[in-house]
Amino acid sequence: MRKLLKSFKTEISPTIEQKIKINKTIGTCRYVYNFYLDHNKTLYDNGEKFMTGKSFSVWLNNEYIPNNPDKIWIKEAYSKAVKKSIEDGCTAFTRFFKHQSAFPNFKKKGKSDVKMYFVKNNPKDCRCESCLLYTSPSPRDPKTSR
């Protein structure tokens, strides 16, 4: 039996600073995803072993960014969002190696659906609060019609 999930679409109206942070994070996620694909493709062409998402994340933070100071802007994005984009790239390669999908595509600005992980209740950026929706009881509801 399939489980049905209920979702609600809400419109957000971020401030200018929040829009800048969101755009930077989405751009960084796109760059890191493409960089992960390119790095593994280069390793494959050189006959080296495939780099998993975890080892790529360690290499990116401990070796690549310190040796390339022009790429320090990667650290400005949410770390969880960057890790999630690396995980997505790793999943794409894993599915490719299992012959479940084609070779992963590079993401292009404006043409690809880039996903981003939002940090919940980060006090520096925004605060998400839950709200309860109250509905009036239905006249046909047996629990409330007594």
Task: Please name every model-derived segment.
Residues 1-136, 140:
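Nucleic-acid substrate recognition interfaces
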